[in-house]
């Protein structure tokens, strides 16, 4: 709903690589930023061909990727891979959101980097727990008042 109010079109696709190819096409045809959002782990690995294509075409695509919850990072959780290391060779810049209050700044930086100098794709990682209210996260992990229950 909020995206419609801001004039942002959401287009759902069946495969992550298609999302990035579509974002690249939007950028090339309209000179407006193309943005793709994909799920963590295998969803992100599926984008590599299209990301590399955008890099070689100097296309400023913004790729948003989910990530495992911050509390589970590096512990072998479902879809927990080093996404930043995977994408670094193929994008101009990578960023990760570590706190909700940093979302705006990281997104602003991503758009700046995508267009600065030679244009190219950028990647932002969004851990899943930052996209939900704190109360939901505490319930997921059995936390109350900052202590494990």
Task: Indicate where each model-derived feature is located.
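N-terminal alpha/beta PP-like core and its mobile active-site loop of ThDP/TPP-dependent enzymes
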Residues: 1-149
């Amino acid at each position: 709903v909020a995206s419609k109010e801001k004039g942002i079109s959401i287009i759902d696709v069946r495969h992550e690589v298609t999302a990035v190819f579509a974002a690249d096409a939007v950028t090339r045809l309209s000179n407006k930023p193309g943005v793709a959002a994909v799920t963590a782990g295998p969803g992100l690995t599926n984008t590599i061909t299209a990301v590399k294509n955008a890099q070689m075409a100097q296309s400023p695509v913004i790729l948003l990727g989910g990530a495992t919850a911050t509390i589970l990072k590096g512990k072998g959780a479902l879809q927990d891979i080093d996404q930043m290391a995977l994408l670094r060779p193929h994008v101009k810049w990578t960023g990760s959101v570590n706190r909700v209050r940093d979302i705006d700044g990281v997104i602003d930086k991503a758009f700046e980097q995508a267009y600065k100098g030679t244009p190219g794709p950028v990647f932002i990682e969004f851990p899943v727990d930052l996209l939900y209210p704190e109360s939901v996260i505490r319930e997921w992990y059995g936390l109350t008042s900052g202590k494990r229950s």
